[in-house]
């Protein structure tokens, strides 16, 4: 990596360490059972990853748990769940010799994204669904910008070119994810979080749809 890329990498990791340390020092959980169930689901989500054509990196469904966390969990719980899922995504069935570097950056980036999305969404007395929309928008933009930034510096490419590829692929599936997450949360609010098992078939269906779409892309 270039010196600029190393500085960028270091700044992201340092900021994430500060955010995570502050969150863990204020750890709280309202329902430990719910936390561990969502953590297990997030672990599974990290294994459902695909490599997108023309893009360095992989995509998984861990953002579903960021949105669930903003709606139902505390900030520290959401950070741990999202970080765990991203760690699994980064190393699961990866033969890349630089996977541990990717792991460090990816977990750092998602930590920043989650905290920013959580803070912005919870800072205003918004209706439930609008809060979810705000969180998803902040997370989407922050995530794609941070990842595109390191790829631009490491690969000496145009930022807009890299970001637009991420944007095109992610946008449709973020939309689907936000919609399905909203439905799950509405059901959970009426019946209790035990219906979180509904997440599993939805996650797998979205994963299969993404795999199918990628196979339809010429050259993949």
Regions found by a protein language model. Give the residues of each.
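Short helix-perturbing small/polar motifs within transmembrane alpha-helices
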Residues: 1-58, 64-165, 169-208
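Cytosolic signal-transmission helices at domain junctions
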Residues: 211-220
């Amino acid at each position: 990596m270039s010196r600029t890329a190393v500085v960028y990498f270091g700044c992201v990791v340092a900021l994430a360490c500060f955010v995570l340390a502050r969150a863990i020092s204020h750890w709280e959980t309202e329902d430990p059972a719910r936390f561990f169930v969502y953590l297990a689901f997030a672990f599974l989500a990290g294994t459902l990853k695909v490599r997108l054509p023309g893009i360095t990196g992989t995509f998984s469904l861990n953002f579903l748990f960021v949105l669930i966390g903003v709606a139902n969990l505390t900030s520290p719980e959401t950070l741990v769940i999202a970080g765990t899922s991203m760690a699994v995504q980064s190393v699961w069935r990866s033969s890349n010799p630089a996977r541990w570097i990717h792991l460090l950056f990816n977990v750092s980036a998602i930590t920043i994204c989650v905290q920013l999305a959580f803070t912005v969404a919870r800072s205003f007395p918004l209706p439930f669904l609008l809060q979810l929309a705000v969180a998803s928008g902040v997370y989407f933009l922050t995530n794609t910008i941070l990842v595109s930034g390191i790829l631009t510096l490491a690969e000496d490419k145009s930022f807009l070119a890299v970001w637009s590829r991420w944007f095109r692929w992610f946008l449709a599936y973020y939309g689907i994810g936000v919609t399905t997450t909203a439905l799950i949360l509405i059901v959970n609010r009426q019946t209790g979080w035990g219906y979180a098992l509904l997440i599993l078939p939805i996650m797998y269906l979205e994963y299969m749809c993404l795999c199918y779409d990628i196979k339809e892309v010429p050259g993949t």
